[in-house]
């Protein structure tokens, strides 16, 4: 928690991008100073287990970005996928009041083990054939996005960072 608080207080740091997940992050909650986060807004990006951090940002009134981590995308062997690279550029470096999330033309479920035998080995990419699949409802939606890794939610329920019912109302 002290590292996170120092990063928020440090005026020379403009973004905090998670290296990878952090399934024990919920344990630092008693030591988080939400006023420090609120009064020192920064770009915060990560995904999966960093859902706890995103809920911290939400409680402090900050927008956070559920997106790539250093090890899993920025540090991708050979290159970061174009879709991810373009999304990061568009979301973080262009002034825009809103944006549309378009379907990627390619995807991967491949995992390349980080070891010396795989230097210069890229994930195998697959061509997307269908675009988005709507699982519930229909058409285009808009609104505030509130979510994260569903496996992490049970760790947050009942804590001070869990959004109340009104905050979930109308959320995507």
What positions do the PLM features span?
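Conserved anion/nucleotide-ligand pocket segment
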Residues: 65-151
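N-terminal small/polar loop signature for handling phosphorylated ligands or for N-terminal nucleophile
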Residues: 1-40
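Structural motif
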Residues: 17, 45, 171-172
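Oxyanion-binding "anion nests"
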Residues: 145-172
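Short, acidic/small-residue loops that bind anionic groups at enzyme active sites
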Residues: 32-57, 63-71
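Short, well-ordered alpha-helical microsegments
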Residues: 25, 53-54, 154
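Short acidic, glycine/serine/threonine-rich loops at helix termini
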Residues: 29, 56-59, 76-79
């Amino acid at each position: 928690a002290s590292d996170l608080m120092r990063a928020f207080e440090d005026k020379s740091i403009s973004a905090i991008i998670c290296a990878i997940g952090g399934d024990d992050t919920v344990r630092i909650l008693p030591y988080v100073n939400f006023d420090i986060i609120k009064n020192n807004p920064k770009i915060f990006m990560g995904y999966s287990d960093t859902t706890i951090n995103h809920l911290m940002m939400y409680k402090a009134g900050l927008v956070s970005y559920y997106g790539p981590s250093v090890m899993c995308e920025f540090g991708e062997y050979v290159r970061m996928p174009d879709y991810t690279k373009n999304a990061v550029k568009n979301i973080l470096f262009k002034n825009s009041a809103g944006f549309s999330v378009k379907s990627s033309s390619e995807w991967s479920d491949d995992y390349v083990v980080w070891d010396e035998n795989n230097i210069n080995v890229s994930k195998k990419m697959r061509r997307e054939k269908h675009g988005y699949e709507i699982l519930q409802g229909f058409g285009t939606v808009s609104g505030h996005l509130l979510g994260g890794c569903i496996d992490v939610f049970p760790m947050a329920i009942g804590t001070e960072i869990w959004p109340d019912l009104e905050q979930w109302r109308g959320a995507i």
